[in-house]
Every structure is written in structure tokens, then in C-alpha cells.
Swiss-Prot record:
Name of the featured protein: Small ribosomal subunit protein bS16m
Phosphothreonine sites (modified residues): T130
Molecular function terms, GO-annotated: structural constituent of ribosome
GO cellular component, one term: mitochondrial inner membrane
Keywords, ordered alphabetically: Mitochondrion, Phosphoprotein, Ribonucleoprotein, Ribosomal protein, Transit peptide
Organism: Bos taurus (Bovine)
Similarity annotation: Belongs to the bacterial ribosomal protein bS16 family.
């Protein structure tokens, strides 16, 4: 079977499909469509297929609405489409991925913070040791 992305990307040299957000809506009222598009196309330009929508403005109940066609997203990922960071985060929040991306990010931040604390503690003990030797 021919890889579907190679057939669709023939017009775009060196390109690949990306699942990303396309901006819509009005001034001060953004609305995003989740689309499968070539990475060389403009953000709000032509796309291959719309896969969902995202309304970042909270409604009267304080909810941000997300609609996803998970079957088609699974299809495009199987065809080799890349994901943008915001879409990856939305899919993690919706439970599409087994691990939410912020869990990994928070773990890395905590690991760096602990390493820095250990380094500062070691420097502090070194300076205290040199001060006691001088006195």
C-alpha cells in the first residue's frame, strides 16, 4: 500500500502532514479548528480535513469546549501525520494519549529543581567549610 502522506504531499516538496490548530473567529473571540494540513501551508490556509474544533473562551458554565473526531485523528496519525504541541496537549487532556503531556513536563521541572537544590546545598556546605578553616 502506498503511504497516503506521500501521495498528498507531492505538490509540497519535503513537506509532511501536520495536525494543528487553524484560527477562526473574530477580534477578541478566537475559535480554532483542528485540521490536518500540509506543514508548508499557512496557518489558516488550505487544509486536507477538519478533525475537530476548540473554543478557548469559557461558556456560561466556565467550560472550554473541544470536539474531536478521534477515528480520523487515529487515521492521520497512522498515515504519519505530525502533531503540533497545542493539539498534543488537547489530545492528552481528552484521554487520547495514555499519559498527559503536562505530567512529563512537571516531572522534568521537578527533577531540574531538585538537582539545583542539591547543587546549592553542596555549594553552601563548601563555603561553610572554607569559612571555618579560615577562622
Amino acid at each position: 500500500m502506498v503511504q497516503l502522506t506521500t501521495v498528498l504531499c507531492k505538490a509540497y516538496r519535503g513537506g509532511h502532514l501536520t495536525i494543528r490548530l487553524a484560527l477562526g473567529g473574530c477580534t477578541n473571540r478566537p475559535f480554532y479548528r483542528i485540521v490536518a494540513a500540509h506543514n508548508k501551508c499557512p496557518r489558516d490556509g488550505r487544509f486536507v480535513e477538519q478533525l475537530g474544533s476548540y473554543d478557548p473562551m469559557p461558556n456560561s458554565h466556565g467550560e472550554k469546549l473541544v470536539a474531536l473526531n478521534l477515528d480520523r485523528i487515529r487515521h492521520w496519525i497512522g498515515c504519519g501525520a505530525h502533531l503540533s504541541k497545542p493539539v498534543e496537549k488537547l489530545l492528552g487532556l481528552s484521554g487520547f494519549f495514555p499519559l498527559h503531556p503536562m505530567v512529563i513536563t512537571n516531572a522534568e521541572r521537578l527533577r531540574r529543581k531538585r538537582a539545583q537544590e542539591v547543587l546549592l546545598a553542596a555549594q553552601k556546605t563548601d563555603t561553610e567549610a572554607t569559612e571555618t578553616k579560615e577562622n
